[in-house]
Amino acid sequence: MSEDSRSQTVRELGEFALIDRINAGREQAAHVLLGPGDDAALLAAPDGRFVVSTDMLVEGRHFRLDWSTPTEIGRKAIAQNAADVVAMGARPTGFVVALGCPADTPVRVVEGIADGMWAEAVRAGGSIAGGDLVHSEQLVISVTAFGDLGGQGALTRSGAVEGDIVAVAGELGWSAGGLAVLSSGADVSDPAFAHALTAHRVPQPPYAEVIDVFGVHIPNALTDVSDGLLADLGHLAAASGVAIDVHAAALTDPELDVVAARLEADAGQWILAGGEDHAFVGTWSPATALPPGWRPIGVVTAGSGVTVDGARPAGATGWESFRGAGATAAPGER
């Protein structure tokens, strides 16, 4: 990055020069037929359908520049959208990004966000097809993700049936642990906190654990863990008209327990209600072998709601934008 770009503000460089800079040298994914530079982008829809998802991140609510680098923020913005697309059984193809920022925002901040977005988009199998850049009072990021079902049926939350095995791919609780470290004022350079901080700043959805089993090991229902395991399983159970019982013993994580002990916190609550891990959780017929990377954590039963070892959870179950998440939410980020 040039010294000029490190000292310039968005006002000084200008909207169109900044757009040119953050798009220079980028290579589009195969499904993006026409990227930035025209009135709109052009994406291929090989089987005539798109999976589409949108999320918005607001500075001070969903991220803080004193807690995360611009590149980390960009990666997180794409990851949470890509995870939604993959959870529907689609391969991410393209992303459209809208960014609002104050005029005195350093150009390097916008460049860092763009670099992070591109890195995660490529990791997910897509690219940034276009977007918008506007003036706003604070940093605001909106991402719309597109995905290709490849001729397969969409995976939804509504297909779980009684007797299904509930299984998860990816880590649980680590993002909440990282948020707890940042919120507590603990020493972020302590190696004991490194993995938790990375999990919160740059979630790593296990895309391959879903994409690689398309058409081979198909779950009856699937969702990603964004609001919290119990909350997201609650959405799945309600959509399917079933109940889900989670087995606490299947969710223990001794390494996360160490982090929680340092903060005098409850790792179990992070795992059950923390959210933002962007793991995937689904239900599978007991006659179907779980694919690699998936582990059983519970069972689908008759009834409604979610229980843990047969009992209704007493604490917070996850995040809700206008209510927060009780002890699992910290002022300034979520």
Residue ranges with predicted function:
Residues 144-155, 162, 192-214:
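Active-site glycine-rich loop that binds ribose-phosphate moieties when present
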Residues 176-194:
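Short, compositionally biased
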Residues 45, 57, 92-180:
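Glycine-rich anion-binding loops of enzyme active sites
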Residues 25, 58-67, 148-149, 190-196, ...:
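Glycine/charged-rich beta-loop-alpha catalytic/anionic-binding loops adjacent to active sites
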Residues 1-86, 331-333:
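N-terminal glycine-rich phosphate/pyrophosphate-binding loops that anchor nucleotide-derived ligands
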Residues 42, 81, 89, 128, ...:
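Residue-level signal for inorganic ion chemistry
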Residues 2-24, 68, 102-127, 134-141, ...:
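Glycine-/charge-enriched secondary-structure boundary and capping motifs
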